[in-house]
């Protein structure tokens, strides 16, 4: 099913405009090519379903993961308790997460979101913990000396300094979520995974290739978008941002 042109244009703007704002023209062209490809191969609705499932899963995973990562970074005892849990979560096969989710929530989108959220959580917890622990003690002592309490030091000093590591964890979480969202078709989740599975059952190589390319483009887009968000923003001086039709130092020629 192909959505109406008006709705399609709205979705394209919602995807392309943030790419221009955070990643520049190159990322925007990549995202535009991706969304046009989704529509060209008649997999727009499936791509949007996968995008919605993954977006909600990543949102919940990042919220819970950052909170747990901060606790790990502030407490050695909490980190020792979480480490074997995270190690176990990362060595378990992806299909194992689908079984308890299906047992408690049945078949559909809800168990897919739960399984994806849990499966993609370890990277954001580990990298948030790493970022918090890498903040220099001198910086924390300076903030305390200027009268900051523990919460102010955490939210105004430690978390901002740990933000590059946290954003790297968000990027890894997105990649892991995309991997499991495709597999979640086995518990009734709709999206690109179901399209690929039906194509494989029918031995339709072209259809399966189209679905795989859609997943590949989605992964590349989110990887580049995550890297663009994690980069430090640098601004040019006001005079350097102006556009001049003729060179200003023409007298040297």
Task: Report the location of each language-model feature.
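Short cytoplasmic-facing helical segments at TM-TM junctions of multi-pass membrane proteins
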Residues: 123-169, 196
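Transmembrane-helix boundary motif in ABC transporter permease subunits
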Residues: 17-20, 34-45, 57-86
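Generic hydrophobic transmembrane alpha-helix motif, especially the helices
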Residues: 53-56, 60-64, 73, 83-120
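Single conserved hydrophobic/aromatic residue that forms the stacking wall/gate
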Residues: 2-7, 11
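Membrane-spanning helices that line or support transport/gating and their immediate boundary helices
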Residues: 46-50, 70, 80-84, 127-134, ...
């Amino acid at each position: 099913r192909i959505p109406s042109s008006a709705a399609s244009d709205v979705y394209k703007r919602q995807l392309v405009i943030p790419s221009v704002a955070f990643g520049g023209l190159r990322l925007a062209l990549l995202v535009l090519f991706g969304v046009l490809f989704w529509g060209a191969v008649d997999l727009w609705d499936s791509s949007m379903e996968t995008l919605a499932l993954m977006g909600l899963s990543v949102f919940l995973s990042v919220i819970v993961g950052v909170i747990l990562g901060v606790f790990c970074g502030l407490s050695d005892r909490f980190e020792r308790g979480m480490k074997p849990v995270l190690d176990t979560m990362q060595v378990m096969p992806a299909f194992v997460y689908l079984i308890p989710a299906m047992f408690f929530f049945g078949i559909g989108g809800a168990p897919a979101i739960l399984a994806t959220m849990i499966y993609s959580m370890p990277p954001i917890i580990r990298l948030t913990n790493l970022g918090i622990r890498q903040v220099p003690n001198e910086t924390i002592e300076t903030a305390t000396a200027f009268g900051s309490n523990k919460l102010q030091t955490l939210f105004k000093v430690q978390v901002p300094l740990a933000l590059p590591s946290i954003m790297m964890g968000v990027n890894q979480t997105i990649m892991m979520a995309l991997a499991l969202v495709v597999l979640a078709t086995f518990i009734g989740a709709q999206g690109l995974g179901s399209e690929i599975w039906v194509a494989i059952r029918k031995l339709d190589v072209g259809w399966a290739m189209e679905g795989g390319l859609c997943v590949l483009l989605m992964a590349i887009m989110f990887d580049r978008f995550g890297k663009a968000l994690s980069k430090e923003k640098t601004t040019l001086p006001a005079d350097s941002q102006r556009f001049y039709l003729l060179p200003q130092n023409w007298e040297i020629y």
